[in-house]
């Protein structure tokens, strides 16, 4: 568990602004050296030399581990599509609650994190409405409190995202496949005619982007009884699973995301995060494309708490979906 948060009163900045800052209790131990790396390397650069290596050793070290992961996670317990703030939050809660589950995260971009590296309009600060600060406390991410008690501010959105990512990828039961796109869903027939989702069809993102100008490049697959899609609003890879449900006939049409209304949007996204068809849970902004909710703009509380709700929904149905997909 992350250490508890501590609150301290900072000095007034040059701007004249002053606010309560919440930080995790990770201060250095008194008396410990704060120059360990300098003590180790400093003043010794003339004789510095890396350990010798053969180029093939590098190739084999990378390849062996990656293909071991491909083999291991070809049959996963949960696949999370999209590694933005919602997907990573889902992975964190799931991996911590169920260390026995194999959780694969598939992210189309080289760099996970989605839009959570910045706040609105490419600004560095990130705003979260209460009670989402509970999630920040869990991670140990510091934040500032303004006079208005209804929200908190993370000074650098990148600190939140990098902290969350580092914790998620530290779990031994999580594997991130970045630069990998989901091209389709694996389905199974059901009695009511709506397909049950039983996995994802994947390919290198660079291959996916060039299907129109190259010959056939078939994909790969990952089986899993529960898929959690958090691919964001409509875009080249956004709202992928939502759009695929329409083309498969499982959903008549998309609701279409409506104009910006923070107050209605965030509550709606969190409350309605759910299993939309057997084996497929949708959360985050992708849900607005299904249900026609408003967009929320540059506030991130709903993303992380939708992730918490998605994890809860997955835990509710996992055992049943696993039995159904056992064949």
From Swiss-Prot:
Q: How is the cofactor bound?
A: Binds 1 Fe cation per subunit.
Asked if the keyword Lipid biosynthesis belongs to this entry, the reply reads no
Catalytic activity, as annotated: [ADP-thiazole synthase]-L-cysteine + glycine + NAD(+) = [ADP-thiazole synthase]-dehydroalanine + ADP-5-ethyl-4-methylthiazole-2-carboxylate + nicotinamide + 3 H2O + 2 H(+)
Q: Which residues bind substrate?
A: 86, 107-108, 115, 182, 218, 233, 285, 295-297
Q: Which cofactor does it need?
A: Fe cation
User: For this protein, what is the EC number?
Assistant: 2.4.2.60
User: What InterPro entries does the database record attribute to this sequence?
Assistant: FAD/NAD-bd_sf, Sti35, Thi4_fam
SUPFAM superfamilies, per the entry: FAD/NAD(P)-binding domain (SSF51905)
What are the UniProt keywords, alphabetically? Cytoplasm, Iron, Metal-binding, NAD, Nucleus, Thiamine biosynthesis, Transferase
> What subcellular compartments does it reside in?
Cytoplasm; Nucleus
Modified residues annotated as 2,3-didehydroalanine (Cys) in this record = 216
- A single cellular component GO annotation: nucleus
Q: Which domain of life is it from?
A: Eukaryota
Q: Give the chief site where it resides.
A: cytoplasm
GO terms for biological process?
mitochondrial genome maintenance; thiamine biosynthetic process; thiazole biosynthetic process
**Modified how:** During the catalytic reaction, a sulfide is transferred from Cys-216 to a reaction intermediate, generating a dehydroalanine residue.
Matching entries from Pfam families are given as:
Thi4
**What is its EC class?**
transferase
GO MF terms on file?
Answer: cysteine-dependent adenosine diphosphate thiazole synthase activity; ferrous iron binding
Family according to the record: Belongs to the THI4 family.
**Quaternary organization:** Homooctamer.
What does the function comment of this entry state? Answer: Involved in biosynthesis of the thiamine precursor thiazole. Catalyzes the conversion of NAD and glycine to adenosine diphosphate 5-(2-hydroxyethyl)-4-methylthiazole-2-carboxylic acid (ADT), an adenylated thiazole intermediate. The reaction includes an iron-dependent sulfide transfer from a conserved cysteine residue of the protein to a thiazole intermediate. The enzyme can only undergo a single turnover, which suggests it is a suicide enzyme. May have additional roles in adaptation to various stress conditions and in DNA damage tolerance.
NCBIfam families tied to this protein: sulfide-dependent adenosine diphosphate thiazole synthase
- The protein's name is Thiamine thiazole synthase
At the highest ranks, the source species' classification is:
Eukaryota, Fungi, Dikarya, Ascomycota, Pezizomycotina
Q: Which gene encodes it?
A: thiA
């Amino acid at each position: 568990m992350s250490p508890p948060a501590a609150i301290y009163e900072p000095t007034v900045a040059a701007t004249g602004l002053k606010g309560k800052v919440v930080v995790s209790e990770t201060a250095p131990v008194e008396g410990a050296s704060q120059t360990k790396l300098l003590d180790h390397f400093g003043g010794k650069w003339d004789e510095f030399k890396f350990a010798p290596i053969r180029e093939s050793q590098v190739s084999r070290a990378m390849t062996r581990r990656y293909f071991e992961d491909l083999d291991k996670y070809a049959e996963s317990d949960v696949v999370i599509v999209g590694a933005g703030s919602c997907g990573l939050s889902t992975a964190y809660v799931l991996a911590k609650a169920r260390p026995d589950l194999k959780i694969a995260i598939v992210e189309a971009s080289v760099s996970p994190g989605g839009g959570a590296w910045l706040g609105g309009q490419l600004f560095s600060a990130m705003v979260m409405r209460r009670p989402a600060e509970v999630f920040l406390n869990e991670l140990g991410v510091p934040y500032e409190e303004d006079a208005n008690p209804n929200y908190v501010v993370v000074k650098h959105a990148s600190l939140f995202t990098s902290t969350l990512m580092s914790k998620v990828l530290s779990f031994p039961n999580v594997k991130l496949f970045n630069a990998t796109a989901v091209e389709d869903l694996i389905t199974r027939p059901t009695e009511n005619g709506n397909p049950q989702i039983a996995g994802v069809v994947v390919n290198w993102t660079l291959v996916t982007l060039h299907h129109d100008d190259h010959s056939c490049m078939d994909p790969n697959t990952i089986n899993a009884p529960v898929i959690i899609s958090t691919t964001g609003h409509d875009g080249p890879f956004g709202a992928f699973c939502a759009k695929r449900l329409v083309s498969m006939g499982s959903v008549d049409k998309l609701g279409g995301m409506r104009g910006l209304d923070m107050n209605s949007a965030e509550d709606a996204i969190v409350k309605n995060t759910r299993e939309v068809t057997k084996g497929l849970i949708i959360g985050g902004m992708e849900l607005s494309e299904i249900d026609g909710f408003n967009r929320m703009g540059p506030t991130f509380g709903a993303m992380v708490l939708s992730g918490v709700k998605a994890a809860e929904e997955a835990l509710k149905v996992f055992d049943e979906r696993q039995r159904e997909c056992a064949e």
